[in-house]
Amino acid sequence: MNKKNTIYNSDTIVALATASGMGAIAVIRLSGANAIEIADQIFKSYSKKSLIDAPSHTVHLGTLEAKNQVIDECLATIFKGTKSYTGEPVVEFSCHGSNYIVEEVIKLCLANGARLAEAGEFTKRAFLNGKLALNQAEAVADLIASDSKASHQVALQQMRGGFTSEIEALRQELLNFASLIELELDFSEEDVEFADRSQFKNLLKTIKTTLSSLIQSFSVGNVLKNGIPVAIVGKPNAGKSTLLNALLNEERAIVSDIAGTTRDTIEETLHIGGIAFRFIDTAGIRDTQDQIEAIGVQKAKEKIEKASVILFLFDDKDNTVSEITTFVKENYREGAKYVLLHNKTDLSPEETTAFDDEILQSLKGYTDTLLRISAKEGQNITELKNFLADYAQTLSHIGKATVVTNIRHYEALSNALQAIEKVEEGMQMHLSGDLLAIDIRETLYHLGTITGEVSNEEVLGNIFSRFCIGK
């Protein structure tokens, strides 16, 4: 990324950087051209030294005072010049985590020339001052919101610039060729080519492959970020709610021998192997005249459409091989993983394994996974969890490959791919350099919107408004 010139904003902002509410420590952050001067007016160091004269990246013990009245004893950490998160002078007060203290310190900063920070304004300044690319800034929000090992690793990799460097490398190579083609336009009367066309074709092929790979990774990245949706489906009274309770190890769903008890979907998140799974207990699927139950059945079918994994419960008493195979084939969706769960096997003789073999043979090409469980007795629930964890690991080599998790990035990559395909078509049609340059510039534009090389205030406002105030 081309570093932008450091922007010392005319105003200095302040906000609580840690979570709100009572706690042991609260960090209050000042950032802006006058941050250190404002801090020096309200902070009295026990060393008697002025913060203005202190070196950058130093910590000072002292008191925060208003009209000679001590508000709190705290630590003041100072960052001078551009050597801070925001790329401008920053002071962070580590105070005791009283709501009253936090309120008084912020009021004191406001009274001495600061203003309240807007949502995400610290990170926005980091972007504007060239400390972060735009997609890295978005990854900061994802990192804060991450609730599993997988989502944490993906966000961390992007925040540290993995995705940024990949996009910038593509953009730079394309920019180099664009410059040569633009140069050709200046010598159009001399009919010379500065850009090697065969080399350019190879570059286009590389860019297309990379863009396609990144676009395809979004389906994986989205579930890693938001949790893998797992629909628990089957006939009424198949044991779906019992399975959800067994997976969670708590009584989350109502369990009853009365068929049709579950009328609506119940969703709970469980972390298995560092990955979030969103288990969805659905209404039993059957033909019914009950209007409310029918709505539940429709919702169940909608969840199947959106799920990455479908756990289909059955038992050998209430289901035939034909019924099971028909259900899977009618609800089959390319890309989803279907897992057959032969439930209530504590009540079934071992001979029913032939029943299972017949099902798998009938569903060859649709699924090859069948587990025998007893949700009520907890049999093979651990094996089911292990299977799901192993399946999730096959989705992506987390932490190794770049995974797209942001819909904005996905759309920009898709637009860039369309533009680069137009360049490729133009090459095949032997179009002139000026026409090729139009589509090349469009590709560069879309790639630039990802890292923030190309941006506008409306887009920035939308992105940073999703942040918490102190970040």
Q: PLM ranges: what are they?
A:
Residues M1-Q153, Q157, G161, Y332, ...:
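A glycine-rich (often HGG/GG-containing) alpha/beta subdomain
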Residues H60-K80, G260-T288:
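Switch I (G2) and immediately adjacent beta-strands of P-loop GTPase domains
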Residues R115, A276-R278, T369:
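Conserved beta-strand segments of alpha/beta enzyme cores
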Residues E293-K317:
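Inter-motif core of Ras-like GTPase G domains
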